[in-house]
Curated annotation (Swiss-Prot):
Recorded GO MF terms: NAD binding; UDP-glucose 6-dehydrogenase activity
Keyword list, A-Z: NAD, Oxidoreductase
Organism expressing this protein natively: Salmonella typhimurium (strain LT2 / SGSC1412 / ATCC 700720)
InterPro entries: 6-PGluconate_DH-like_C_sf, 6PGD_dom2, NAD(P)-bd_dom_sf, UDP-Glc/GDP-Man, UDP-Glc/GDP-Man_DH_C, UDP-Glc/GDP-Man_DH_C_sf, UDP-Glc/GDP-Man_DH_dimer, UDP-Glc/GDP-Man_DH_N
Family note: Belongs to the UDP-glucose/GDP-mannose dehydrogenase family.
Gene that specifies this protein: udg
GO biological process: lipopolysaccharide biosynthetic process; UDP-glucuronate biosynthetic process
Active site per UniProt: 253
Protein name as annotated: UDP-glucose 6-dehydrogenase
Domain of life according to the entry: Bacteria
Amino acid sequence: MKITISGTGYVGLSNGLLIAQHHDVVALDIVPSRVELLNDRISPIVDKEIQQFLKEDNIRFRATLDKFDAYQNADYVIIATPTDYDPKTNYFNTSSVESVMQDVISINPAAVMIIKSTVPVGFTAAMRQKFATENIIFSPEFLREGKALYDNLYPSRIVIGEQSERAREFAALLQEGAIKQEIPTLFTDSTEAEAIKLFANTYLAMRVAYFNELDSYAETLGLNTRQIIEGVCLDPRIGNHYNNPSFGYGGYCLPKDTKQLLANYQSVPNNIISAIVEANRTRKDFIADAILARKPKVVGIYRLIMKSGSDNFRASSIQGIMKRIKAKGVEVIIYEPVMEEDTFFNSRLERDLHCFKQQADVIISNRMAAELLDVAEKVYTRDLFGSD
């Protein structure tokens, strides 16, 4: 079977390499340097399992810039292109997904398109009508950046937004590549599958916001946050997981998915979802005020990335803190080794960690790192448990 992947980010590569253990996979991208890296079996992103799989001889995987080469004779085309949230329209920008669909229908109308990109509720049904085809299925992705392939090898669940034989066939491709056995698999209608993805991420954002608000309360009243969280999480209905305070939820998925869900249901009475978005803003204000209370002349930002093991700093929570501090006229310097630029939002990047530590009066780090232990007295973090 020939499977094509459109988009070579975390979602595309993790799905492609999972399936390439047993089938021929072609990855399509528009960036020549990225395609060249992949054909040299070098990962363009930081992900241990992706890096390992690319080195394996039995992985039937190649990359191309040629959409005709990619789409011709493909049985399935997995669409994993970016759908950034557009604050002007309160909507995901789905233009890249729609462009892929147009190309696939022109080149290989028999191919079944599987949307892995996150899309608004109702998008798949609208695209079937727009392009006059039933060959579009939505299947949400549940993965962590930096552990994308791992999360496909050991998936928590598989959701396919169609109840059909071809949906079961695609689910079998994912199950075949996974190491985990007995994977919970759910077949739903397309719109319900889209809602599952957005509501799942919104719940995670709510949990982050909840423990952050608990931490803000404890900090304000001089209480021990760790003791409170440990006591609260002994209740098995709450559970001792995903409870480490932070600078707010961030990254590529949670901020845009909560806002999209809010926009999707603006005509439906709701309180919780809007409160989650507002709570995240309030948390960033609280953190910035706590840092400014130390009256630093220079604040050092240790890493822009959202979490350890990732090379992605899109919409990371620490950026919101940085912007609030800069707005008060405080100088900000940044240590971020994965960035090639010399500045970020008009703040200087310091590439030497020792010099960075010397120059900063306060170093802010969303998660504590071993290489900051020698200047622990300078570090401001709300990391209590050493986990994401």
